[in-house]
Amino acid sequence: MSNELISAVVQAGIVGAGGAGFPTHVKLNAKADTVIINGAECEPLLRVDQQLMALKAEKMLTALDWIVEHVGAQRGVVALKSHYHNAVDALNAALPNHPKLAVHEMGAFYPAGDEQVIVCEVTGRVVPEGGIPIQVGVVVTNVETVLNLYDAVTAQTPVTQKYVTLTGAVHTPKTVLVPLGITVREALELAGGPTVDKYSIINGGPMMGRLVSPDSYITKTTKGLIVLPEGHSLLNSLNKPLDRIMRDAAIACMQCSLCIEVCPRANLGHRLAPHKLMRMAAYGSLCDEKDTPMNAYLCCGCRLCEYACVMNLQPWKLNGNLKGILGKNGIRNNLKNAPEAPHPFRELKRYPVHKLIHQLDLDVYDVPAPLDETPYVAKKVTLPLRQHVGAPAQPCVELGDTVEEGALVACIPEKALSANIHASISGTVTEVTGDYIVIQA
């Protein structure tokens, strides 16, 4: 099965379906003792994984068995929140057929789905600073990714569609299955469109998602689209300029350190102290010789620091800026400490999701988004060549070519970290550039 599995994953163009889009065939080229399916879906409002686990538990566990065998693991674990009752029941009902697998239930806290947090929750191990789970013998993958793997192995089905939650200020919140490459605007129409005239759209969750144009495209990593009305507090936060953040840090930061109390990286034992980086940025203070701008590399961008701050400051955005400056100057992260254990009070510092939803002013949008798998027939798709971490895929079709849905249209460049891309509809190739391929039905 091992060679067959990797070959199927490569051919199908499978990447991480919920995060940065790391090519799965590379991630699975490893040896580990534990494989974790991350079913936490910790971002508020997103409803994809919890429904897929409830409806496709047996397929997912079968694929997890294959991955466990491939990496030589002793066990596989599905980690999810205990209040996903339908998913928990479905998984437990299927477990007797899978003796190497288990379910790990977690509380409703944020960010339970951060891969370093979930490794600690399931195994008690701490991933080193700037590290990845395989360094402690763990492979972490995503619910939809594993289901894509099942389809690739059993039916040679490539990744051409994506499950996406459509929510926020839309007429009918729902979770849909849509072809890759349709526009965000087109996808939102499946939920009845926005309920307001002036709005912004977040691609991803409200905490770690990014603002996108209605004319941007659905890709392999799109998990949710959240519509928010103009003037919403979350949009104001995302749009706050860096110069104002720096000014506010100098004026308002009182070094209370509430940000470090909730920081998931600090609570894993990593040397990240958001309040000290705020002090450094605001005053150029290096009074603690152990702190350098390099500490910003340890920030995962979860944004909890902002919502713990009584002054509404944004250490996460400052950290992101520092990382950008360091990267542009060729300065790499040299912080690689490996804590033996997390903070002793880590479990007491978990941040409740219901509290976070209220702080985000999203209570009115915290509603079900039932899964609707009705096929959507698109007339045109634009397939970005970089839907994953690494090098963009290389077009292997030409202008005027006729392609069938599922046909390979962009290939992995030789010896590159990349992923194949396939036609999500049948039609004619009407445009090929270095950035995307357009197919018209």
Go through each PLM region and give its residues:
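Histidine-anchored nucleotide/phosphate-binding helix
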Residues: A54-H70
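Ferredoxin-type iron-sulfur electron-transfer modules in oxidoreductases and energy-metabolism complexes
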Residues: L228-A250, L258-I260, R265-P342, A378
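Extended boundary segments
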Residues: R125-P128, N142, R332-P375, I437-V438
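Hydrophobic alpha-helical positions that pack around
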Residues: Q74-V184, L190-D197, G205-P206
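Short, well-structured beta-strand-loop connectors
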Residues: E261, E398-C411
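Generic structural motif
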Residues: R350-K355, V364, A369, Q387-A391, ...
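Gly-rich Lys/Arg/Thr-decorated short loops/hinges at beta-loop-alpha junctions or inter-strand turns
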Residues: I37-D49, V170
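Short, Lys/Arg- and Gly-enriched loop/turn segments at beta-strand edges
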Residues: S233-S237, C411-A423
